[in-house]
Amino acid sequence: MNAYKKQKIGIFGLGKTGISVYEELKNKYDLIVYDDLEANRDIFKELFGNNLITVLSDSRWQDLDKIVLSPGVPLTHEVVRIAHHFNIPIISDIDLFFEKSKNLKFIAITGTNGKSTTTALISHILNSNGLDYPVAGNIGVPALQAKASNEGYVLELSSFQLDLVKSFTVKVAVLLNITPDHLDRYQDMNDYIAAKAKIFDRMDKDSYAVINIDNDYCRKIFVLLQKDQSIKLIPFSVTKILKNGISIVDDKIHDNDLTYKLPLNKNLQGLHNCENIAASYAVAKIIGLESKKILESISSFQSLHHRMQYIGSINNISFYNDSKATNAISALQSIKALDNIYWLAGGIPKEGGIEGIKPYFNKIKKAYFYGQAKAMFANTAKNIIDFVICDNLEYAFNIAYKDAVSDTTEVKNILLAPSCSSYDQFKNFEERGELFIKLSKRHWQ
């Protein structure tokens, strides 16, 4: 951290990331801080006092050596304009983290969907085989608050974080997929793709790029990277067997010329999780693990909360919590993985609603729509599937459970895959998912 000695640094954004930056830099540098959200400023005041909170109109923001920007702050924000006008470098918490951990190995994962599961799965595989690779980043653990390691880290990086990173070099960079998302932040789809591709800007001759070539956008990036002879490329696919790369087809993992049976794990169902497994397997092989050890670790993985999380079964009914599925593309992955689904969906709808799920409505036994999206979703589903319009998630769950119990089908699944953000009725997707877990567990406790 000597590079920041006696410097004047501004911290903009006081959520989890901003707080972690402050705790890293406090008492070492001349700091000022701010956040547009009064709630975040109030939390900061309670923790650290009011002395450092400085509005943007204060001239001290124009006389800084650096500004550490939280990833949620749009690059069109006034603080960014000030930084550019006064030639103040903007950095991120990832830059600070890398500076103090630069001798370690970094595995970075990005993609529109599946980042958190893949990050956790890679960490699980490595750690269960005697290595020490904690998770950090967008997975919910700010990098600067990550568990100490002498070996390396598995970092989940969003496009927002990749926009900010300046000095970070990775051992392995993973690109899982790219689908339309965050288009309120980016000018267009090309701008969003370029943000994701930045994960490959920070590689050296010893680095590996692991890329899903089933995805059209990712495949184009793969083709471009083939022109750079210094980067080692590992493609993966779940639709075809690759001669050189990792494939999962027909419940088998194909590792170049070798073939292994895919381990059964209820927490990793569906084609989307095959992508996550393929990427994780590739990374573990790069780090040096044997295939047998990797497969054993995959079979013992416990899924992250709220991400196609298997809760349990009773009366031939299985309960799955995919509260993190905040758009139709994410929800579709869970729906593809199951049959005879009693589907709970609703909240604040995203553009396009559930139109993208219509080709798979045959997997849904009955739907239960709630929240702001209920009328919109009902309009999409009418004359195609049975549905009930509900006031809230708890009411939807109770009706769904009653219907599932009366169904004589051998296997039934109650799935929370909202396809919406949660803010109309919940603080966040975690709170929504916890309610579903609580309601599910009532029936076998």
UniProtKB/Swiss-Prot annotation:
Record-listed ATP binding positions: G111, T112, N113, G114, K115, S116, T117
Entry keyword set: ATP-binding, Cell cycle, Cell division, Cell shape, Cell wall biogenesis/degradation, Cytoplasm, Ligase, Nucleotide-binding, Peptidoglycan synthesis
Cellular compartment(s): Cytoplasm
SUPFAM superfamilies: MurCD N-terminal domain, MurD-like peptide ligases, catalytic domain, MurD-like peptide ligases, peptide-binding domain
The reaction(s) this protein catalyses: UDP-N-acetyl-alpha-D-muramoyl-L-alanine + D-glutamate + ATP = UDP-N-acetyl-alpha-D-muramoyl-L-alanyl-D-glutamate + ADP + phosphate + H(+)
Pathway the protein contributes to: Cell wall biogenesis; peptidoglycan biosynthesis
Gene Ontology, cellular component aspect: cytoplasm
Membership in a protein family: Belongs to the MurCDEF family.
PANTHER family membership: UDP-N-ACETYLMURAMOYLALANINE--D-GLUTAMATE LIGASE
Family matches, as NCBIfam families: murD (TIGR01087)
Cited function: Cell wall formation. Catalyzes the addition of glutamate to the nucleotide precursor UDP-N-acetylmuramoyl-L-alanine (UMA).
Protein name: UDP-N-acetylmuramoylalanine--D-glutamate ligase
Species per Swiss-Prot/TrEMBL record: Rickettsia prowazekii (strain Madrid E)
